[in-house]
Amino acid sequence: MDFDAKKIDAMNINKPLLPASLKGGAGAIIVDPPWNIQQSGNFGAINHYNLMTLEQIRALPVGSLCAENAHCWLWVTNATMEYGFEILRIWGFTPRSIFTWFKPRLGLGVYLRGMTEHILLGSKGKAPVKVKNQPNFGVFPVQEHSHKPEEIYNIVERVSPGPYLELFARRPRYGWAAWGEEITSDIAIPGFPVPKYSDTLIKDFQKKTGGV
């Protein structure tokens, strides 16, 4: 067991631990789940990171990480889009729109070869839309596996109110809190442990629990 796991055991907390920057919950959250649907084989995501079942993704307490009025941006593939709408609703969000990322490279596919990926926008409460002139598609280059376009963060910041949180993040971004297996996480989610938590979160948790 590593240092962080000794300080915060996500299997033994009953509500999310959030930093001061997310007091009241996130105003906008990006979620990029490691779907296990059509991700086997030599070129599938199974070769890059641990995958999650639909049941595990549904169980994520995304709604409780967000403010009363918030946006959720959920990444889906063509194969998982139908489940994405269902999961948004389970998390407490109403699906509102789809943003499509066009990739200038021929991808994989069972029937047709994929050149797109999508991010579903859902809302709860009365979260405002900050601008009304954002198109619902963009053409961005493909980078390493599962590296999403940096432009997406700019779009979210332009459209949605903060503060901002990303789940399954793979790299930190200024002004955003993040959680995932590949980074130092700024939050802790009950039942979903990750390898490393930020020093700030650990200290806050120790103060609340009287830990050393």
Predicted regions and their residues:
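Class I S-adenosyl-L-methionine-dependent methyltransferase catalytic core
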Residues: 1-212
